[in-house]
Amino acid sequence: MRTTRCGLLAVWLGINAGATGAAEVTLIAPGGIRDAIVKMIPDFERSSGHTVKATFGSGLGTKQQVMKGEVFDVPVVQPPLDEVTATGHVLNASATPLATVAVAVAVRKGMPKPDISTAEAVKKMLLAAKTISYPDGAKGAAAGVSFDATMRQLGIFEEMKPKIVRVQGGAAAMAAIARGEVELGLTFLSEIHDPGVEVVGVLPREISTPTALFGFIHTKAGSPEAARALFDYLSSPAAAGVYRDMGMQPGR
């Protein structure tokens, strides 16, 4: 699949490459879309001649960096968008949905997969679990914020507290499962790649709304043409295939 996607991206970039010289393009994005972007950057660089300097972090942390005025040619943020557009740091008209990503449940490889088909089934699974791990929402992790809201909606947030092992990032949560330190793990589906775990599935939409990720062009982009090339690439039909491969839904 990777070869196919890369070929499509190379063709798209060859058609859409700008006439300007090579430039460095800076990008900032949350961890939920990190792996998809990292997968695509080499093909963009080869085909466009530009280079990309990418910064990744928590959903809240990266958004705050943009809001405070740090300049990244292509910022990728999660809603609400009004907080970002009100700062004047981004071109409001450039707002484009790139992808959405859902919170998923994972277990250690070879372990039974619990039923998560309904809200009641998820509640039963969580109450029966001895330990769970997921990214720390208090530190800005969007997956953690989302799952905290799910537990509150289910009415079990306080009851679950003694069982929770909060970590920094989805990869750490998956590693804890693979090592047998916790029974269940949750993070964005796009972050589950550890060979020691297996995906059970995504949480039902009735208790967990997928997180949307929007791209912008910064008002102070160092090379507007190069920024536009990367921005258009990340929202292209070819890139949509990469998002799907990584467990995300394309924004358009």
Question: Where on the chain are the PLM-derived regions?
Answer:
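Positively charged n-region of N-terminal signal peptides that target proteins for export
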Residues: 1-5
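Exported/periplasmic ABC-transporter solute-binding proteins
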Residues: 22-70, 77-88, 94-101, 107-252
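Bacterial N-terminal signal peptides
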Residues: 6-16
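Bacterial Sec-dependent signal peptides at the C-terminal "C-region" and cleavage site
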Residues: 15-23
